[in-house]
Amino acid sequence: MKHIEIYTDGSCLNNPGFGGWAYILRYKEYQKEGFGAEANTTNNRMELMAIIESLKALKEPCEISLFTDSNLMVQSINEWLEGWIKKDFKGKKNIDLWKEYIKVAKSHKIKAFWVKAHNGHLENERCDTLAREAALKIARENDEKH
């Protein structure tokens, strides 16, 4: 099983509001970036969307070290998700995305790690920039329509 590093970030201009997500996949010297945006979303949805989209980009089962500045994502993936499944997500938010995460994550071995935001962590800073730019772009496009 290949060992992949994934770095993710989500951004929301107002919470809720225009949001963006981004990821960096790294395998040895290979690196791939991805990003996107939504018009009406939250920061937590964008954090989770970055993770989901990064996993969709993988072509085979992998062992993954996932790095995010969202403590909620780290704890959800490493600790809480199994309990949520057993309780059928009762009282939880973003159930649609968590169910999608489960579907795209099931073939991988994933361990999530927290990195401090805005602390000079190169990949986290890059994801932050990409996610924020995606959110700003969709906000500008929306302004132009109105």
UniProtKB/Swiss-Prot annotation:
Its cofactor is Mg(2+). It comes from the Bacteria. Binds 1 Mg(2+) ion per subunit. May bind a second metal ion at a regulatory site, or after substrate binding. One of its GO terms (molecular function) is RNA-DNA hybrid ribonuclease activity. It is found in: Cytoplasm. CDD domains: RNase_HI_prokaryote_like. NCBIfam families: PRK00203.1 (NF001236). Belongs to the RNase H family. Monomer. This is Ribonuclease HI. It comes from Campylobacter jejuni subsp. jejuni serotype O:2 (strain ATCC 700819 / NCTC 11168). The gene is rnhA.
